Amino acid sequence: MVLTDSEMEFIRKELGRDPNPLEYGMLDVMFSEHCSYKSSRPVLGLFPTEGEDVIIGPGDDAGVVEITDELALVIGIESHNHPSAIEPYGGAGTGIGGILRDIISMGAMPVALLDSLRFGYLEDQKSRYLFEHVVRGISDYGNRVGVPTVAGEVEFDENFQLNPLVNVMCAGLVPKNDIKRGIAPRPGDVFLLMGGRTGRDGIHGVTFASEELTSSSELEDRPAVQVGDPFTKKMVMEASFEIMDEIEVSGVKDLGGGGLTCCISELVAKCDNGARVSLEAIPLREEGMTPYEIMLSESQERMIFVMAPDDVEAAMEICRKYELPAAVIGEVTDTGRMIVESEGEVIADLPAKLLADPPVVEREARKPQLPEGQVEVKHPPLKDTLLKLISSPNIASKRWVYRQYDHEVQIRTVVKPGDDAAVLRVDGTTGVALTVDCNSIHTKLDPYGGGAASVGEAIRNVVSMGAWPVCIVDCLNFGNPEKPEVFWQFRECVRGMADMAETFSTPVISGNVSFYNETEGVTVNPSPVVGVAGKLSLDSIKTLDFKDEGEEIVVIGETGPELGASEYLRTVHGIVDGKPPETDLKAEFEAAKAVKEIIDGSGNKVTAVHDCSAGGIAVAVAEMAIKSGIGARIDPMKIPGRFRNIHEALFSESNGRYIMTVRGSARDILGGLDVPWAVIGTTGGRTLEFGDVALDISELDDAYHGVIEAYMST
């Protein structure tokens, strides 16, 4: 139970009485951090949420933007961190199920999944166990429901050892005239519950997600983890689309965190309406369930449709066709109250808005001590450094992960996992580039800069594909907001993200906040996972691999002496410290704008584009060479910027940088740009040369591939 003394005082004042046990349970889940966003709501208001392409912004199950004249892109992101720490296979699978239902409830067909995963170092046996079973849970669920997992990211750090992070993004497509909403606007309409039966799994799941984990959580909190069923989910998807095609439903919403209590109260509260719910009508999986268990159950694969009574039989016939339990469980009223009945007796009577719109909490924020300067280290030989970096699990190939996913199903995937972003076909000429990114180390050491840089990196990844960002979604993973230092991190991170989004005039249309990611006093690195969707023409797609020999290699953007918080320091020196790279909002925007203009205006003369992030320029060029099998000769001293030595030139993670290759003269193509750029080398041969240091492509390939496979075979 999480209701505080002040919350109970507020509730008593609103009701004029004490809540009964069922009402207390309903209020408890709705006042949880997971459902109410009571700590984060005042801060989330910093995000820009409006734009000319925005159809539905934050506040519904997912955000919606126009992507063509006829179609809308529906996109959302969710976390399933606590359940995945307790039961990794089931927790990850039900995370997939939840975000799929969010997209379906907007009327959209899910077309892509992306995942952002964080675990402890793979030397740790428990971390390997969690990693293996989370990936298997994602792949089994996604593959069985027929939705491709097309991109993602994985990070390993000791601060995720006890508390992994499992974030999942989903995108869907829907004709603009067929978009649905999570509302119940018409009194007299009824609630049709369909899908999986209601059982005892997941009770108090949202309360569990709003508390720190402990050493006993794995045993004590296992009942709070929901049980997924991908086969039923597939049937629910098919039946849902048939119902929405054939019946004029006035509202649709999935049952996720908070179960029936959350779903129905939110449906009616948005329209200042009320609800009357009859418990005996609800299809149950288990005998003897109490009203408390029924109203708080988070059993999976359930949907609520709001419709006129005359349409019920047609909907029931569709459910029978798919052999799915379904029942009318109540009706929309004009009272503004949520009333629960059992055997004709009223057992709960609460204002719907009290449930759906709890008061916010003003948290104390206090700045912790942060690094102000750079870390001085002795630099090892360049060749050894690069080989160690690209064989780090944080940089090495993630094919062990994505080869378990079906990324081809639905045949929309144009650019597959392993590039800067995935590209999906929307129609014959239009594509959408999708990515998720985060830099938890930068955010830990500079929350404002790390938040801004995470948005910047995600935007760079879609721009590198030839797209321009149309919307942002976010999943904000932090520790206990009751701790002033944690809440300061959160506030500053959101401020940085909002400033970068505002600079690009790109709206944040949906998101999720996951607090209390702490176990036994260890707080996860603050992790602002950013999803970006970009629109592009299918005939202008760029990929990161070198295409031919004799092409000029260009760097756009400046490199500074910024090894602080870098993957170089973490991997080579075992140091997580130092001031992260500066974030120049204007420079980030101008570089992205320049790259997009070059791609669009140069015909096919730009042959490859890659964003520069973890590991710096050396790693980015190595990845381009490894993927193509073509070598390159680089002169580090030609890199534009201010650096003191070759290691700073090659491994600094300065923001706002791109690497591209061009056919012909770079000066002819880039000469008019008003951003820093320089030709730093040419492609060719079977070695990668940085000055007088040369590495065979085969040696780089061996170091880059098979790293995670080797860990997971132990």
Swiss-Prot record:
Going by the UniProt record, its keywords in alphabetical order are: ATP-binding, Cytoplasm, Ligase, Magnesium, Metal-binding, Nucleotide-binding, Purine biosynthesis
Q: Give the reactions, separated by semicolons, that this protein catalyses.
A: N(2)-formyl-N(1)-(5-phospho-beta-D-ribosyl)glycinamide + L-glutamine + ATP + H2O = 2-formamido-N(1)-(5-O-phospho-beta-D-ribosyl)acetamidine + L-glutamate + ADP + phosphate + H(+)
GO terms for biological process, alphabetical: 'de novo' IMP biosynthetic process
Under the GO molecular function aspect, what terms does this record hold?
A: ATP binding; magnesium ion binding; phosphoribosylformylglycinamidine synthase activity
- Per UniProt, ATP binds at Y37, D474, G511
Q: What is this protein for, i.e. what is its function?
A: Part of the phosphoribosylformylglycinamidine synthase complex involved in the purines biosynthetic pathway. Catalyzes the ATP-dependent conversion of formylglycinamide ribonucleotide (FGAR) and glutamine to yield formylglycinamidine ribonucleotide (FGAM) and glutamate. The FGAM synthase complex is composed of three subunits. PurQ produces an ammonia molecule by converting glutamine to glutamate. PurL transfers the ammonia molecule to FGAR to form FGAM in an ATP-dependent manner.
Name the family the entry cites.
Belongs to the FGAMS family.
Protein name per Swiss-Prot or TrEMBL: Phosphoribosylformylglycinamidine synthase subunit PurL
Q: What gene makes this protein?
A: purL
